Amino acid sequence: MTTTNNRRDFVKSAATLAAIASPLSTLAQSFDFKPNQRYPDPNVFILDPSFAKYRIYSSTIEQVGTGMRWAEGPVYFPSEKAGAPGYLLVSDIPNNRLMKFDEATNKFTVHKTNVNYANGNTRDRQGRLVTCEHSVTRRVVRTEKNGKITVLADSFEGKRLNAPNDIVVKSDDSIWFTDPLFGIGGEWEGSRGKSEQATTNVYRIDKSGKITAVITDLFNPNGIAFSPDEKKLYVVEWKGTPNRSIWSFDVNADGTVSNKTKLIDADGTGTLDGFRVDRDGNLWCGWGYNGSFQATATDIGGGMKAHLPNAKAEEMDGVKVFNKDGKAIGFIRLPERCANLEFGGPKRNRLYMASCHSLYALYVESHGAV
């Protein structure tokens, strides 16, 4: 017994040291992603020693569902029976449907169609589904336990919302959501529409149903989440200048926010999207190559230069983890760009990653903040 434990400890320690010591240039090597049986999973990178404790060395990335056209808005519903498997819903926006992954059966099926191009989803404190319908209807709705749909917001100051995108519910039952332009910009994820709002805002719906614009100076706000103590609000500015960013705000007792501070700045080729905060305050961020034309001029002879991209999609697609101070500490490499995440599983330690066409899962040594 002692010998076996010592061997396991040695293997784990060696793997930890190797992962920490591995040069970050390994991320720049092209690869063919294949779910593997090797422990530890070579697609989970420790960028800082502080991330080592979150990595489970006998856990590998699994593809638990596929066949979507753009996966977004994962939300987990725990079982009513403590410790039992629950299920996860995820938006397949272009196909105008919600998909369902059942943890008990491992089946991935269509949950509901004609969902008004649902994007972000969350669960309120009463266990009800709250959804951003980001095209056509352009509203935030709640699905009651009997299946009835309640409209929570579809306009502000007499003008239609743009395209509600991502959403979070605070412990005081207020609902906070972002309202960029994505859902009305074309036909792929709904129908082209006209913006009636002068700005792209972050809104708060209080318990009485009153809607307030709490942030009005972000261009196309996207992912949104609170810190574990709810004293900070984090919001992605998807069209930030010069780069996409996550901004931090202090949350005041009256429901307003203040002290806008840039927490995370994506590089010129990186894309921040949806994200989740764990109980330690780390931000697990959907990440990927943004398709930008930033390039390096390379001499190819004859006085000619080729402009080669500074990054490859396969170097960047996945989940990037930052600590509460904005330092990158970990990276989970995926074969598809990750748009959004959710902590699920009976112990809330299974990280679900909605990524382009597929849904991936990885057990981690962490829990979601909510």
List the predicted regions and their residue ranges.
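Asp-box/WD-like beta-propeller blade repeats and closely related beta-sheet repeat scaffolds
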Residues: 141-174, 178-185, 190
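Blade/loop signatures of beta-propeller domains
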Residues: 31-59
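A short beta-strand motif characteristic of beta-propeller blades
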Residues: 62-65, 107-112, 150-156, 211-215, ...
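A short loop-to-beta-strand structural motif that recurs across blades of beta-propeller domains
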Residues: 97-99, 139-141, 201-203, 245-247, ...
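Short, conserved, GDST-rich strand-edge loop motifs in beta-rich repeat architectures
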Residues: 35, 178-196, 289-312
